[in-house]
Amino acid sequence: LEQLTTDSSGQTENISLPAPPEEYSLEPGIYQPYSEYNVLVEAEGFQPLNISGTEVLAGAQAIQPAKLTGDEDSTPSEDPIVIPDHTLFGNYPPKIAEAEVKPVGESGEIVLSRVVVPQTVVVHEGTPTDSTAKDYYVPYRDYIKNVASSEIYSTWPQSTITANVLAIMSFTLNRVYTEWYRNQGYDFTITSSTAFDHKWIYGRNIFESISQVVDEIFDSFLSRPGVRQPILTQYCDGRKVQCPRWMTQWGSCSLGQQGYSPIEILRYYYGDSMYINTAEQIAGIPASWPGYDLTVGSSGDKVRQLQ
């Protein structure tokens, strides 16, 4: 359809591509609301990259990242990258319900002293017990943009996008703060399974309207009075899956269309005690103090986490 050349910063010009009517993405229905395109990226000195399933929505700017692997690199690139169905259109396992606040036991299951925004999230591409699944080190903001682009449509009202991004970030920061998976003996922050966490898709495209919201509020999370940890804000689509006392994605779209603000949408589902809080930023992957200093010659899980 198109052949483009990147500029000095590695970006192409914007192009327009056909997509289904925008209204398909504003109400649940049987028609796929986005077009799918295949992208081939080639550059001298690099291995070619094929991406299958880039999603394009009507009236929305899609951004397709493409990280190339050098010819001299002995590690083959993932080729092709296949982007599966969007969670609102495809079939995925429903979220297994959890308590929105994790217990703080005397044994110290929760030991991070403050809520922090990690520089990097370690994403396990599968269920927690799937030892064959890969772990990916993903910058926090890139992770949130990917998840939001996989979980909601970028054509939705900005207040709806903001409410959903806040829920995604608070859920993620709860996993960081509680060291949920590390305390179970795993070396990752979160999974890509919708049954346990939310959907992250390796190599997928994101959307400009979602990216802008994340950049504006990436250090925010959701709180309740007297609770230190970010709230584990669970949600579902509200059409294929029902989830009382959780936010429904299609319902949040409707509320945004009615003029509800982000916090009004969130309180509609999670209650009036919910409020927006701000976290500290931090470099690296947060991990609690192991009970002893790490020095030259130290070994074990805590050293591996820091590495």
Task: Map each language-model feature to its residues.
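Charged, low-complexity interaction regions that mediate assembly/partner binding
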Residues: L1-E2, P80
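Short, conserved glycine- and acidic-residue-centered signature motifs
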Residues: G10, Q32, T248
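Short, acidic Ser/Thr/Gly-rich low-complexity loop/linker segments typical of extracellular
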Residues: E2-L26
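Surface-exposed coil/turn segments at beta-strand junctions on protein surfaces, enriched
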Residues: T5-D7, I30-Y34, L57-G59
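A short, solvent-exposed beta-strand micro-motif common in secreted/extracellular proteins
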Residues: E22-G45
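Conserved, single-site charged/polar hotspot
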Residues: L17, L40-G53, A58-Q307
